Amino acid sequence: TFDIVFIDGLHLEDQVDRDIQNSLKFLNKNGTVVLHDCLPISEWHQRQVYGGGGIWAGTVWRSVAKLRMTDSSLEINVVDIDWGCGILRKKTKNTLFKKSIIDYSFYEENKNELMNVITAEQFKELYK
């Protein structure tokens, strides 16, 4: 089992979903999963196909958003640094984000609440 798992692989929702589920299977009780590229800054940066050249966050954000809407057994925060670093920990009875639509315009309008965005300073306090 692992204390920490870092996911920064193929930046597509389906693969990220699998990476998260596989990581959680082998995560220690108090372990943490960290995901990179959770906060794309534009619709172009979250496109499905990389195509080379420049930064690509892909659709990682969709995997995090789905978990925020459906899995109350996970504590989820996204630290607003380096394209968004998602922090997932096994907990109980967490509040779910109560929506089911997740397209980019919805993400853009609701990013902070949907992704449970925190600052680097808040991260330092929460995860001492």
What kind of region is each of these model predictions?
Residues 1-6, 10-128:
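A short alpha-helical cap/connector motif
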